[in-house]
């Protein structure tokens, strides 16, 4: 499968997920706190290269792939490279946003509004401490609704769907900045000996 077909397949998967999440939010009234990027500041977020392939392809088309790869190669922080604090003083307090929100990965989309099954087979919402504490009533109501059959995106289901697009790239779970690097490298290597996409002569 070509890179562009993989990108379109991932985009299509995300489009369906975004609709599911919007429906879940509407039914539960759960939402991220405005201006909060606390979950993005965790240093132990893992992801697959495939979920960031649309982001890497976007960089490539805009001539930013090689530069971003260089930046990632010298980056010492484990915090996601795409995360952008609102200001210098907000660097460590969780106030920030994704600088490429449209192209955020699967883990970024699922966390907060996706669920996993516990050892008893029960659905447990995977969300942050802030939502659990500041939206406690809605969170408890949502958790109860899950037990009663409310539809919610499931992490394992979506990662299985992702791996069906590319088994290797979809199952390679690594630290998030490594995933970003591998996604860019995949695009650059693909076009190293192939013509650039039509209409894009100065990519990379």
PLM region descriptions:
Residues 1-34, 38, 42, 46-204:
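Short loop/turn segments that flank or connect secondary-structure elements
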């Amino acid at each position: 499968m070509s890179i562009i077909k993989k990108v379109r397949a991932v985009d299509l998967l995300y489009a369906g997920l975004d609709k599911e999440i919007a429906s879940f939010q509407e039914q539960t009234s759960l939402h991220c706190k405005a201006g909060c990027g606390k979950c993005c500041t965790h240093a132990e977020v893992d992801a697959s290269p495939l979920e960031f392939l649309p982001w890497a392809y976007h960089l490539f088309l805009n001539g930013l792939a090689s530069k971003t790869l260089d930046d990632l190669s010298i980056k010492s922080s484990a915090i996601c490279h795409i995360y952008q604090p609102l200001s210098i003083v907000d660097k460590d307090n969780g106030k920030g946003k994704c600088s490429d929100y449209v192209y955020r990965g699967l883990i970024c989309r699922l966390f907060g509004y996706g669920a996993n099954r516990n050892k008893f087979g029960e659905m447990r919402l995977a969300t942050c401490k802030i939502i659990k504490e500041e939206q406690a009533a809605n969170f408890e109501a949502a958790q109860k609704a899950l037990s009663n059959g409310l539809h919610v995106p499931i992490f394992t289901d979506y990662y299985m769907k992702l791996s069906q697009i590319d088994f290797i790239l979809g199952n390679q779970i690594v630290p998030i900045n490594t995933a970003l690097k591998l996604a860019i490298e995949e695009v650059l290597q693909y076009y190293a000996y192939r013509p650039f996409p039509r209409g894009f002569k100065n990519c990379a």
